[in-house]
Amino acid sequence: MTVRFLFEALNMAIDEEMARNDKVALLGEDIGHYGGSYKVTQNLYAKYGEHRVIDTPIAENSFVGAAIGAAMTGLVTVVEGMNMGFILLAFSQISNNMGMLSATSGGHYHIPIVLRGPGGVGKQLGAEHSQRLECYFQSVPGLQIVACSTPYNAKGLLKSAIRSKNPIFFLEHVLLYNLKAEVPDNDYVLPLEKAEIVRQGNDITILTYSRMRYNVIQAVKVLVEKGYDPEIIDLISLKPFDIETIGKSIQKTHKVLIVEESMMTGGISNVLQSLILENFFDDLDNRPMCLSSPNVPTPYSGPLEEVSIVQTADIIESVEQILTNKM
């Protein structure tokens, strides 16, 4: 075990998979000589060369399309979006080709492609660089969505994503790259469709993912001091959801709070709330509560940015409302 930053764990995952499979190739802006904006691809250009680590023009629609075409011919392509907000420029390729080609070709083609990069609300990156695209991509048929949250699961999940035959949107939060934790030095993979029980509890199920995992953990420390016993589940797989793990927790606690950084309208919490009501209605003491960001562009101002997303105090207040029947 070695203590590593999350960006280093991602770098290790890519390096190991490129060494394991010579069909793995990287595409993206400044991923070669520069090593990527957040150094996830550092040293890979020198090790594997320009034919496998490809610096692209600033043309997201074109290089995502090229990566899809390469995947159709047998390569495994890992595409970095310098910022996930820019990937919106490739939405046609992602929706019409990356997600659906396997089905529309009758299974003739597999599209082994991982679309990864920084997203989420950062420190004063402005509205255009604070996009949360998991909501947009929820409706794309054939596309899996995975959100890493620790150095350990970042490495194991990315390795699994690269080995998958399916197209995967791999979400990395911009504020988690410098998170440090122990990472095994050996080769390991983690299941892409399995949630993680971060803390076991009996009073309420709190479902969350990515950066909000840490806001929830901080809130639960306060709640435990007040005598509450919440269960925390990191969803990890945002499409499909690990409905088995979620369901077992709900059948134990009978109460649910969903915490996300995304906006509620069209957000992850809306979809998950519907699934919970459809599958576990009789197990609930009250309706699942969704705690999401307001439907506004992310402000550049630091203080305004802070109030534009869910804070620890909001989580504490929501849990107490649910557990005291004051919803």
Swiss-Prot record:
What is the superkingdom listed in this entry's lineage?
Eukaryota
SUPFAM superfamilies referenced in this protein's UniProt entry, alphabetically: Thiamin diphosphate-binding fold (THDP-binding) (SSF52518), TK C-terminal domain-like (SSF52922)
Where do the annotations place thiamine diphosphate binding? E60
Q: Kindly list the GO molecular function terms attached to this UniProt entry.
A: metal ion binding; pyruvate dehydrogenase (acetyl-transferring) activity
Residue ranges spanning the membrane: these are none
Q: Which reaction does it catalyse?
A: N(6)-[(R)-lipoyl]-L-lysyl-[protein] + pyruvate + H(+) = N(6)-[(R)-S(8)-acetyldihydrolipoyl]-L-lysyl-[protein] + CO2
Where is this protein localized, as stated in its record? Plastid, Chloroplast
State the disulfide connectivity.
none
User: Which GO terms of the cellular component aspect does the record hold?
Assistant: chloroplast
Cofactor list: thiamine diphosphate
Q: Does the keyword Oxidoreductase apply?
A: yes
Q: Which keywords annotate this record?
A: Chloroplast, Metal-binding, Oxidoreductase, Plastid, Potassium, Pyruvate, Thiamine pyrophosphate
Binding positions (K(+)): I113, A161, I162, N166
Subcellular location, principal: plastid
State how it assembles.
Heterodimer of an alpha and a beta chain.
Q: What does this protein do?
A: The pyruvate dehydrogenase complex catalyzes the overall conversion of pyruvate to acetyl-CoA and CO(2). It contains multiple copies of three enzymatic components: pyruvate dehydrogenase (E1), dihydrolipoamide acetyltransferase (E2) and lipoamide dehydrogenase (E3).
Task: Output this protein's name.
Answer: Pyruvate dehydrogenase E1 component subunit beta
Name the source organism: Mesostigma viride
Native organism taxonomy: Eukaryota, Viridiplantae, Streptophyta, Mesostigmatophyceae, Mesostigmatales
